[in-house]
Every structure is written in structure tokens, then in C-alpha cells.
A protein has these predicted regions:
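Ubiquitin-like/PB1-type beta-grasp interaction modules and other compact soluble beta-rich domains
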Residues: 1-90
């Protein structure tokens, strides 16, 4: 199933500057695997060493934060838009 993944500026070095890329998968985990196959290294910036979402990275499937759904097992229906949003901190 094809989905659209919106890539934040800080991760666009992995996508050749593309702000939106296509990926396939029926769950978020599968989409991230497919995304990493096409854009090596990007998954390591989204997931931590234990394979969970990094603490300061939010991922939305449609308008819903996956942390309040099924996390990496969240379904990703065909045509869904996924947004990767890193937290911004400053002082």
C-alpha cells in the first residue's frame, strides 16, 4: 500500500532534499522499513536503539499521533499521509 511521508527539513539530507516521499507498508513499522530501504539511514534518526520512536520525534498517521494509537503497529491505509515532526527546543 502506498503512503506519502512528509519529511522535516532536518532529515531531508536522507531524501535528496525531497520534502515528501512515497513508501509502502500496511503498518508504520513496515513503512519505516521501506523508507529506510529507499533512503538509507533515515530510520535510525526516527527510531532509537531499542527500535521505538525517539523521544523527541512525533509521528502522525493522518492527524493522529501514533503514540496514542498502536505506535509502530499503527495501520497505514493506502493513500495515508504520514508526518514526521521533530521537537524543537530553544532557550
Amino acid at each position: 500500500m502506498a503512503v506519502s511521508v512528509r519529511i522535516p527539513t532536518i532529515l531531508r539530507t536522507y531524501t535528496g532534499g525531497e520534502s515528501e516521499v512515497s513508501a509502502s507498508g500496511t503498518t508504520l513499522a513496515e513503512v519505516l522499513d521501506d523508507l529506510d530501504a529507499s533512503h538509507p539511514g533515515i530510520k535510525g534518526r526516527i527510531l532509537d536503539d531499542n527500535g521505538g520512536l525517539r523521544r523527541f520525534v512525533n509521528v502522525y498517521v493522518g492527524n493522529d499521533d501514533v503514540r496514542f494509537l498502536d505506535d509502530l503497529a499503527t495501520p497505514t491505509p493506502d493513500g495515508t499521509q504520514i508526518s514526521v515532526i521533530p521537537a524543537v527546543a530553544g532557550g
